[in-house]
């Protein structure tokens, strides 16, 4: 069964725009409900999909953070070209890292980071995550266990330079947190199984933003946008956006 690849989305509403950024191995579906909620509150939302994401995992390994950052910048430019002068950004996981990078690269009204990593995981741990993603993708395609095993063996022979580059990106953004002055809302799931939750404290403590807040979600895991506190998260992000000086 061929999986229909997810698409970027653009929900047009009011003149305030929010760029929504998904995580590594994720896609726009991870931020779609948030996008629909914000649209209902009058915010225009756009979520790009990074190169190599939402497609067979064999394509992921041939892309890297430079490609994905270009997709983020293209998403920002897309909103600018549509006439949106004022743009906020909200990102999940790697998307949160990119949100911070946007914060010291282009004018941004406000930043929401959700479960964004600031600690470097070993390449082995990251690689395990990629293998798990690849296996899950193949299962969703309805392939037999035998075919999946064969394809996974082949997949494991492909070198993944991406992971080293991903580590370097996180380290680089962490080094530049003190260049961020935009209002920032740091969101972190207490039971995050993917990243070190202390990342949230690093972001909160090291950015120079005079207006900043941090909130811990006690019942949520890493993909907080799809977890059981998502409705509360939606309301909190909306309240933060409403507090900005648009």
From Swiss-Prot:
Keywords: Hydrolase, Serine esterase
Disulfide bonds: none
pH dependence: Optimum pH is 9.
Signal peptide coordinates: none
Active-site annotation: 93, 192, 222
Pfam families (UniProt xref): Hydrolase_4 (PF12146)
Catalytically driven reaction(s): a carboxylic ester + H2O = an alcohol + a carboxylate + H(+)
Single Gene Ontology MF annotation: carboxylesterase activity
Highest taxon above the source species: Bacteria
Class of the enzyme per the UniProt entry, highest EC level: hydrolase
Temperature and activity: Optimum temperature is 70 degrees Celsius.
UniProt cross-references to Gene3D superfamilies, sorted A to Z: alpha/beta hydrolase (3.40.50.1820)
EC numbers for this chain: 3.1.1.1
InterPro entries per UniProt: AB_hydrolase_fold (IPR029058), Esterase_lipase (IPR012354), Hydrolase_4 (IPR022742), MAG_DAG_Lipase (IPR051044)
Coiled coil: none
Family, as annotated: Belongs to the lipase/esterase LIP3/BchO family.
Biological function: Involved in the detoxification of xenobiotics. Shows maximal activity with C6 substrates, with gradually decreasing activity from C8 to C12 substrates. No activity for higher chain length substrates acids rather than long-chain ones.
Subunit structure: Homodimer.
This protein's name: Carboxylesterase
Gene: est
